Structure formats: C-alpha cells, structure tokens
C-alpha cells in the first residue's frame, strides 16, 4: 500500500504571518490535526495539535498572540506519495513524528498522520498476509 492510497488531497495551510488562533480554527473547521505553515507562499513547517497545545502551555499567552512564524522551521523529514506506508511509518517511528508531510517536488500534497495509518491497519495487515502468501508460492 502506498502513501498516496491513504492520504487525502486536502491540505490545511496558513501563512506564517497569521496567529495560532487562525491555524487552530482552520484545523477545527477542516477536522484535521495539522496545518502547513507557509512563509511567503512556500511550505515551511508543519503544525500539529500537540505543537499548538505545547505552545499555549509554554507561552501562557492567548492563541491570537502566538505567531505561526515560530512553526516555520522547515521539514526535517518528508515522504513522497509513491513510497510504501511501511516505509513512511518507519520514518514516523524513528523520528518520533505524529504526522509526516507528503511532498511532490516542492509541493506539499498531503500529510500522513498516525490516524491515517490506524484507520487503514486492517488493509495493511491483509496486504502483508497476501504478500507473504505470494512469497511462499515463489519460494517453491
């Protein structure tokens, strides 16, 4: 199963000049747990629900007073749509990520989340079992 099979095309984006309130509102309205932060129209960071909560806790300021530019720190890790979900999960686990940007060139075309993986766990398991069955046939 490929990353493109389980990520949606809708990506929530907000400018780094906006506030955390803007991003949290957009995330809530889109029923998603992440927001891409753009600096001058270029994807420059990934804000997750956990990041938002941590920023509130650390700063003690209202959401409207926290700028999104603090989250425009780049992408340490990303995956392309043609990679397997297993590969992407390996990246998420090894880097301690709850969400992974999906890039096509310089564009962010989606975000793979832990929720996406869990929602497709049955299909991933079925695919693994089928692949193991084929492997056993090939080895005969």
Feature names for model-found ranges:
Residues 1-10, 48-78, 84-93, 108, ...:
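Tandem CBS (Bateman) regulatory domains
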Residues 27-30, 35-51, 92, 100-116:
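A glycine-centered beta-loop-beta connector
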Residues 13-31, 38-39, 78-96, 103, ...:
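The conserved cystathionine-beta-synthase
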């Amino acid at each position: 199963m490929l990353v493109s099979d389980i990520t949606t095309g809708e990506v929530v984006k907000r400018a780094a000049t906006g506030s955390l309130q803007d991003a949290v509102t957009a995330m809530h309205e889109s029923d998603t747990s992440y927001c891409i932060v753009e600096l001058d129209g270029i994807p420059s960071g990934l804000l997750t629900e956990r990041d938002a909560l941590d920023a509130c806790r650390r700063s003690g300021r209202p959401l409207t007073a926290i700028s999104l530019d603090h989250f425009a720190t780049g992408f340490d890790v990303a995956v392309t749509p043609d990679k397997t979900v297993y590969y992407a999960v390996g990246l998420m686990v090894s880097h301690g990520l709850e969400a992974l940007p999906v890039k096509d060139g310089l564009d962010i075309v989606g975000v793979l989340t832990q929720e996406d993986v869990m929602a497709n766990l049955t299909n991933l398991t079925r695919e693994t079992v089928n692949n193991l069955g084929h492997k056993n046939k090939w080895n005969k």
